[in-house]
Design a protein with these regions (language model features):
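Short linear capping/connector segments at secondary-structure termini
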Residues: 5, 40-42, 117
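Short capping/connector residues at structural and topological boundaries
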Residues: 8, 15, 50, 72-74
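Active-site segment of metal-dependent pyrophosphate-handling enzymes
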Residues: 25, 29-65
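Conserved Nudix-box catalytic region and its N-terminal flanking loop in Nudix hydrolases
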Residues: 1-26
Length: 118
């Protein structure tokens, strides 16, 4: 097993941000309060299909800490930023987390410019 954030594939007719919300609800039972596009895209090579995937990263504020875990997962935990950085296996996921954290903790206009109206 490995630890990672909520993730999933875009279904036909979905926008990437809609996929993030659907996966959030399916995997955790949580609802989004606020959402923004992070200043980072993650990418990885997938041998099956011989393709490079480019994945947008989103920051989502949720309505609760009470998670209803889906059957595709075995556990969850809430952790602080440093613990999350140390726990994530993939560099792309760490960089995405760092981008979200940096946008949340800095007082600049990127949060306003990248906000997604729900």
């Amino acid at each position: 097993h490995l630890w990672q954030g909520v993730a999933g594939k875009i279904e036909n007719g979905e926008e990437a941000w809609q996929t993030a919300i659907r996966e959030l609800k399916e995997e955790t039972g949580l609802d989004p309060l606020n959402m923004f596009v992070a200043d980072h895209t993650s990418s990885f090579y997938e041998v099956k299909g011989n393709r490079i995937n480019i994945i947008p990263v989103f920051g989502i504020e949720v309505n609760s800490k009470e998670v209803l875990l889906s059957e595709e997962h075995v556990d969850y935990k809430w952790v602080d930023f440093e613990s999350a950085r140390k726990t994530l296996v993939w560099n792309g996921q760490r960089k995405g987390l760092e981008a979200v954290y940096e946008m949340i903790t800095n007082s600049d206009d990127r949060m306003r410019w990248s906000k997604i109206e729900l």
